[in-house]
């Protein structure tokens, strides 16, 4: 499941594009997630009231959370699969405090791929999408293993 160095470079090149506007990309990812998978919105008490795309776009809290999500993910991706230290506290909080099912992380990964492709179509072609899919699947698989260690089977 590992990525080649070339694949990691494609992932990191996409991550650099995201870093130029973490909050904007993050907000777009969360809106895509919530619109495509409305059940995920129920896990976010502070966003449950946001029912329309216009209300989501106007939410500074949603933008801040998107920034937090993509900052954490960017830090993990930069580790090129050697993300044990970063993953452990994230898995702990998502399993025990937030109780986020793994399937929601897969839905978030789909939203990330969609947003990157829509915002950067020239730079995020099939090869970059494939590499990012592999990197996000590695992340999801590793966090699922941590969930299992914690006794969370969500």
UniProtKB/Swiss-Prot annotation:
InterPro entries: Globin, Globin-like_sf, Myoglobin
Catalytic reaction list: Fe(III)-heme b-[protein] + nitric oxide + H2O = Fe(II)-heme b-[protein] + nitrite + 2 H(+); H2O2 + AH2 = A + 2 H2O
GO molecular function: heme binding; metal ion binding; nitrite reductase activity; oxygen binding; oxygen carrier activity; peroxidase activity
Keyword Transport among UniProt keywords: yes
Biological process (GO), any one: removal of superoxide radicals
Family stated for the protein in its record: Belongs to the globin family.
Record's protein name: Myoglobin
Organism name: Delphinapterus leucas (Beluga whale)
Gene giving rise to this polypeptide: MB
